[in-house]
């Protein structure tokens, strides 16, 4: 199967969703996940254009940037599989594919986009920080007697497009030097609300309770994942470290 990708995935009046926009080798379930994610987001973008014409341009640009990110990340994630096949079989077929995937991974790394493993990420609208970074942040949280959360030195809050229900809206997003593209939700947890709770409470259970008291309740595992992500992305830092 031949790989292909569009130079642009959407414009007002046209959306290239799923395989219409790009195709990756059917080496794993990556392509299925990509198509599901693309179709889901395309429906939201189309709905937004119909009910809020003023958001059409922002919506199609959002879709275009997400599709480009998805393609580059799945190509990056497929590189180890091709390299393994090339080492096992040594044929030009696998060697050329391994080289192409490796080159694509380098391009993705140089793009300025956050590096991540997206093998379990369907929509790429939430955090796709490397699991190792999030886990390391979680381990550091567990090592503290007091959370001591303070605002990250490079944290900035800016307005950008995001998904709210079945439409694209302009919303406040959190960005940092480690995550310049910004994010708002992780596992359904509102990061803006979370950082306020975390900075106001030195004990994680108290922060979780405060978060749930101020809005839609989330589970403790989801809260902990979002909290760890906030530290890993540089939105929060440990101002007081007591072990």
Language model features: what each stretch is:
Residues 214-222:
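Short, basic interhelical loop/turn and adjoining N-cap
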Residues 34-45, 193:
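Short amphipathic alpha-helical face segments that pack within enzyme cores
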Residues 70-134:
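Extended amphipathic alpha-helical segments with heptad-repeat/coiled-coil character used for oligomerization
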Residues 116-199, 221-243:
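Acidic, low-complexity/disordered tracts enriched in E/D and polar residues
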Residues 22, 28, 41-97:
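Active-site-proximal substrate-binding core of FAD-dependent oxidoreductases
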Residues 1-11, 67-69:
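Flavin (FAD/FMN) cofactor-binding core of flavoprotein oxidoreductases
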Residues 9-28:
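Short FAD-binding loop at a beta-strand-to-alpha-helix junction that anchors the flavin cofactor
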Residues 194, 201-214:
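Short acidic, hydrophobic short linear motifs in intrinsically disordered regions
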């Amino acid at each position: 199967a031949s790989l292909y990708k569009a130079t642009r995935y959407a414009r007002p009046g046209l959306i290239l969703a799923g395989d219409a926009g790009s195709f990756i080798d059917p080496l794993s379930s990556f392509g299925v996940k990509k198509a599901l994610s693309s179709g889901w987001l395309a429906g939201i973008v189309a709905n937004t254009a119909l009910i809020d014409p003023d958001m059409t341009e922002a919506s199609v640009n959002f879709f275009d940037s997400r599709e480009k990110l998805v393609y580059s990340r799945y190509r990056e994630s497929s590189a180890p599989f091709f390299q393994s096949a090339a080492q096992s079989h040594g044929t030009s077929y696998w060697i050329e594919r391994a080289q192409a995937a490796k080159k694509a991974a380098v391009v993705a790394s140089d793009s300025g986009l956050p590096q991540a493993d997206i093998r379990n990420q369907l929509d790429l609208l939430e955090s796709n920080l490397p699991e190792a970074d999030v886990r390391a942040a979680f381990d550091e949280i567990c090592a503290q007697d007091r959370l001591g959360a303070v605002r990250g030195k490079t944290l900035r809050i800016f307005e950008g497009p995001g998904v709210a229900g079945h439409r694209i809206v302009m919303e406040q997003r959190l960005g940092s030097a480690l995550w310049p593209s910004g994010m708002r939700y992780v596992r359904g947890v509102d990061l803006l609300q979370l950082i306020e709770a975390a900075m106001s409470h030195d004990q994680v259970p108290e922060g979780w309770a405060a978060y749930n008291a101020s809005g839609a309740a989330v589970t403790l595992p989801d809260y902990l994942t979002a909290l760890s992500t906030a530290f890993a992305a540089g939105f929060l830092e440990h101002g007081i470290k007591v072990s």
